[in-house]
Amino acid sequence: MGKNKLLYPSLTLLLLLLLPTDASVSGKPQYMVLVPSLLHTETPEKGCLLLSHLNETVTVSASLESVRENRSLFTDVVAEKDLFHCVSFTLPRSPTSQEVMFLTIQVKGPTQEFKKRTTVLVKNEESLVFVQTDKPIYKPEQTVKFRIVLLDESFHPLNELVPLVYVEDPKGNRIAQWQNLEVENGLQQLTFPLSSEPFQGSYKVVVQKGSGGTAEHPFTVEEFVLPKFEVQVRMPKIITILEEEVQVSVCGLYTYGKPVPGRVTMNMCRKYRNPSNCYGEESNAVCEKFSGELNNEGCFSQQVNTKIFQLKRQEFEMKIEVEAKIQEEGTEVELTGKGATEITTTITKLSFVTVDSNLRRGIPFTGKVLLVDGKGVPMPNKVIFITANEANHNSNTTTDEHGLAQFSITTTKIKGTSLSIRVKYKDHSPCYGYQWLSEEHQDAYHSANLVFSRSNSFVYLEPLPRELPCGKTQTVQAHYVLKGQVLKDLKELVFYYLIMAKGGIVRSGTHTLPVEQGDMQGHFSMSVPVESDIAPVARLLIYAILPDGEVVGDSARYEIEHCLANKVGLNFSPGQSFPASQAHLRVTASPQSLCALRAVDQSVLLMRPEAELSAATVYNLLPVKDLSSFPSSVNQQEEDNEDCISHDNVYINGIMYFPVSNTNEKDMYSFLQDMGLKAFTNSKIHKPKICPQPEEHRIQHHTLLASPVRAEMGRNRDFVHFDDTSEPPTETVRKYFPETWIWDLVVVSSSGVHEVEVTVPDTITEWKAGALCLSRDTGLGLSPTASLRVFQPFFVELTMPYSVIRGEAFTLKATVLNYLPKCIRVSVQLEASPAFLAVPEKEQETYCICGNGRQTVSWAVTPKSLGNVNFTVSAEAVESQELCGSEVPVVPEHGRKDTIIKPLLVEPEGLEKEVIFNSLLCPSVDFVFLGAEDGGQVLRHFPPAAATDTAADAHDPARPGAKVSESLSLKLPPNVVEESARASFSVLGDILGSAMRNTQNLLQMPYGCGEQNMARFAPNIYVLDYLNETQQLTAELKSKAILYLNTGYQRQLLYKHFDGSYSTFGEHRGNSEGNTWLTAFVLKSFAQARGYIFIDEAHITEALTWLAQKQKSNGCFRSTGTLLNNAIKGGVDDEVTLSAYITIALLEMPLPVTHPVVRNALFCLDSAWKSAKEGSQGSHVYTKALLAYAFALAGNQERRTEVLTSLYEEAVKEDNTIHWTRPQKPRLLTEDIYQPRAPSAEVEMTAYVILAHVTAQPAPNPEDLKRATSIVKWISKQQNCQGGFSSTQDTVVALHALSRYGAATFTSARKAAQVTIQSSGTFSTKFQVENSNRLLLQQVSLPEVPGEYSMSVTGEGCVYLQTSLKYNILPKKDEFPFALEVQTLPQTCDGPKAHTSFQISLSVSYIGSRPASNMAIVDVKMVSGFIPLKPTVKMLERSNVSRTEVSNNHVLIYLDKVTNETLTLTFTVLQDIPVRDLKPAIVKVYDYYETDEFAVAEYSAPCSKDIGNA
């Protein structure tokens, strides 16, 4: 190493001496054409030509060559001696989104020719799309309003056809769609209504562009009450570990700007990095609590000592979090705000403000650094130290009042081709300790590369320190050093410059410099107007061609403010108004702009903050913001035609050194590459390269490089009053409380102004408004937010929940607020209504309220009607001689009475039940039902060629296109809750449509074990296979399914055992043994998923090996582990059933029948079937269904046919359907008016028969498909509203069967089908189903419940119809298969804590027809206002309880099984919100696999009648 350092300068000097010295080519014609390496179609692009010293007229031409065609871009005839200009050209749209093409530039004259060919990337211009909703969150039954905005890459509006727009709910259902939408002037507004009972959660609007890309915008649907005030937590953003105190303030501010009175509770915590759930809160975090009253400004401040938070300890997170709750005075409404402060070990920090990434030998290297403390505050008058070893530089300097310091480093004697600079303030602390943090003083590091020049002539651009603001002209200094020996007799030197932005050349220019004798050094300035055309990143290139053909230059990168050319303004006049008054909204923008306006209640934004639509978000849509290099597909090194340097190797001390080209040095070519520009030139832009030597002359060992190897650094040049004219009314009635007030389109006049007169809503709040404007000339513009505060000094407001239960009393609170300077006496009245019963808390006629005071009046209200019930409350200032304190109350001249009318949703009492009716109606399929025959059905096969064979056939009602009908009778049980019934009717064009949209939510029951996770995993494979086979798979559906597969794969590994097997709850639940059945399920699913996601082969190999070890000598498999579903044990031959299941799994992987494990397993099954045929007892239906499918997979058609024949002897044939039942199934409760869905095991076994039919080899015959169709009709009737079934295994097997059947019968050529549903009365609705909307969920509410309806389908294909009937019932004692008792401790309202806390004790046992249940779920609903204490729920997890969950006001307890022995479960609940006259809550226990085996009970809080007084 030492030799290398000593010899290094000598070798560098040697290379310099080897440069040619007779390179003068003065007067030789020079050509330089610069074109971006990325070109967009259908938009103007530029290429810049520089031709100098021409001695004849030449033609410059550019052509683009693709695999399809050659296209001329431009042709210029140049007669001038010197020329510099940029040519614009436009490429047509390409059939592919992007492709690499060859660009050829030719300069040709009578005596000379220059031609060069290189690659460029050509991309089709992408339209930029974004969506704006009128607000971020919606309630049920509200209308969602949204806008689609389409722009080109210059932000100008587009007229474009959008193929598809749709809205997707949280379950993945497509609930609204628009096809082939013509968007004009870049904007389209759409709306759709939410149903009364939509899924709650995150929705999204999806826009599919013509190019195939999509844009998405989320919104939320919830039941909510808007917050009236904001809780602001104010604390430092950052503190250092040396801080001893931190100031925290909590403030409450109403949306109309007034302070909130009340009390604050503040919890300040520093969490552990690795918290524990075992020891309560203190094992999660170190916390300190504070509380106090808010002051007159609505704030509470606390100086907190940081000692408790142990800022110097490592085991904590590096932040302190604050959660503050403000309880409003009078209403007890409590809202929460959060804040956090970061903890840093950085005490001081140095950073480079302006510094070049390159250096030029002989020119001082300068820069500027900034010193700040840990909080980012500049530190003045501090000494800092600068070190640059390669330049042998050590110095110090002092920061100025802004914390800045400049430095300069001499580069004349620099070693090597790069410079590393270190700037430090203080040395780091020498003290280190385990789990302790040390203070840090961050140094600044920078590396700069040497710029190569043959003549040591340079031009360089001065760095700028900051983002450049729009609307101003920026001066850029260009410095130059020019050697006289190369300038010779030149009179003037022209510098050329280009500015690139968004990947294209946008500006160009020149600067002429008079040439003086000798060496020249100086600078000149260039003025750059900063506008939107060069945002968000501008790259500036400057260069000049010297007389000898050398090109000198530099490039710089500047961050530009995100600005838009269309300057939009928005303001309200006046800025503060009374409710229901008139106001003006003034919009200013470019003339003739189309402006979209929006004004939203600030409370909505407090409820759900949204990402602000800003210039930055629009710029983020750009596919190319900055072309920092060549695209990777064209990033090969350009051919260098310049001469290489040849010389001998150097021998020193017996070692041979050979020179290499230095990779760190920058040359003109690298500056052009930084710009993303392809250069076509005969000038010298490359540094000299070493001529390659024969390989045999090289020394392979102990070779030292003539230049050090360093990583090349990227270039970084980072641098309230009322309007007197508005008179308030004497009395106000306020009933209009929109959440979105303004949602309009207006066109700005030719003067650039538009005024809208608006009526202010009745909400006392602040409205936040914005405008989005589009102009053909200037493009997009966005206004700053405009605010209008709506206020009156005397008003009343109501505090109500989102909804209440009929008959359940709640407290209605009306708060009267007086912001007048004087006291007033107020009368408050609640208008009586037959819809509710109201009892005032206090019988008081009037209340005294002084300035800035309030009074809350309460009523105990019991609703009597369902739906939206209006509450009307009036507050009136009355005349009185009774003093308010020492003051005589006044009656305001204006606004003496305020009336507010607000609705409240009243929901039915009791237990909600849902009944699903499914139908698969097929007016035209290959197989059509003709009617019943001998208790079964007859089907006819219509081959397509026989569509018009005979006249008789044409009139056959079963022919394709015939009408197929089915009746629908909606009935209600006698114990139905009055007015609670509602029904909806849905149409889908695909048999798997609902399931493929809901693969994560197929079951309406909890998930929490390894089997349930696989039930979510496996259907994704079947859906992907089905969509692939039917050519319906879209990129969006594929990505969603693959996401689910990846997450399911990772989750399933949690349940893996060390030996490769899997169990229901994994090893951590104390299960020492894997489960044979579940391991087989996982094995086949992982194997099938390999085609879509990465699956580690080790998991498959280990599971297969483990299963092989369980195979007995007769080929059958031993059962190990606990089966949660004991229905699989219900057959006569447990071993055969399990072996059949495992054999199926192995064949589905797929393993060949010749595989030893499979071959032996098939021997087991064949032997078992022979024994069953010969024996008198036969075989269980479940077992036979599995055997039929196993033999079908194995290709044993003889055995398959035998087993199917036996199965059909036991089939149940009714209503044109076929299915199978178990001989001894559990007794079902018979009091329901509707037959419950079939048990899980019966769906599963019936689905296996479908698979046996459609897996017939080599292909299913018409008879197989005929029978499969009959079975599918029955299976489809068992689906739930999510597309799943009762439980896990039936869902997995049935969806597998439906996907195979769907693929076997699918046709893409079908025409439309028309669906009609009509009642016996006047209601009738039609739907159209075709290929384009077959995945769209079309839905309508049914008006008559109870009622009689008929459903009919005409046209072609099968249509899946689903009706959902919901109603509430009052539960009653019955003969349940479970014994369930619920008690509360205490049972009565005794003791000081009974109002706020009690225990729920559950006793459960199984008394059904079986020895024990399968896995069971206990679902405990909380009474209103109470929440479970999670640690007490977690403590239930012991031998019989596998898992617990707390979700959506429910506690879910998983039981491995329930026997006749009583199991007792107890946990604690705490009061969250006081509620009066609590209704009982429901507890339900049910068998996970036999969901019709259940029991319900109810419990009441100990203090149900008076708990609201707590």
Curated annotation (Swiss-Prot):
Region of interest called Inhibitory, as start-end residue ranges on this chain: 706-711, 721-725, 732-737
Gene name, Swiss-Prot/TrEMBL: A2M
The text of the family note is: Belongs to the protease inhibitor I39 (alpha-2-macroglobulin) family.
Pfam families named in the record? A2M, A2M_BRD, A2M_recep, MG2, MG3, MG4, TED_complement
Q: Which organism is it from?
A: Bos taurus
Q: What does this protein do?
A: Is able to inhibit all four classes of proteinases by a unique 'trapping' mechanism. This protein has a peptide stretch, called the 'bait region' which contains specific cleavage sites for different proteinases. When a proteinase cleaves the bait region, a conformational change is induced in the protein which traps the proteinase. The entrapped enzyme remains active against low molecular weight substrates (activity against high molecular weight substrates is greatly reduced).
| Lineage, top ranks | Eukaryota, Metazoa, Chordata, Craniata, Vertebrata
Keyword S-adenosyl-L-methionine in annotation: no
Q: Where in the cell is it found?
A: Secreted
Cross-link Isoglutamyl cysteine thioester (Cys-Gln): located at? C1009-Q1012
Using the UniProt annotation, give the residues that carry a glycan (glycosylation sites): N55, N70, N870, N1028, N1440, N1460
* Membrane-spanning ranges: none
Q: Which InterPro entries match?
A: A-macroglobulin_rcpt-bd, A-macroglobulin_rcpt-bd_sf, A2M/Complement_sys, A2M_N_BRD, A2M_TED, Alpha-macroglob_thiol-ester_cl, Alpha-macroglobulin_TED, Ig-like_fold
Keyword Membrane assigned to the entry: answer is no
Cystines in this chain: C48-C86, C251-C299, C269-C287, C470-C563, C595-C773, C644-C691, C823-C850, C848-C884, C922-C1358, C1116-C1164, C1389-C1503
Q: What is this protein called?
A: Alpha-2-macroglobulin
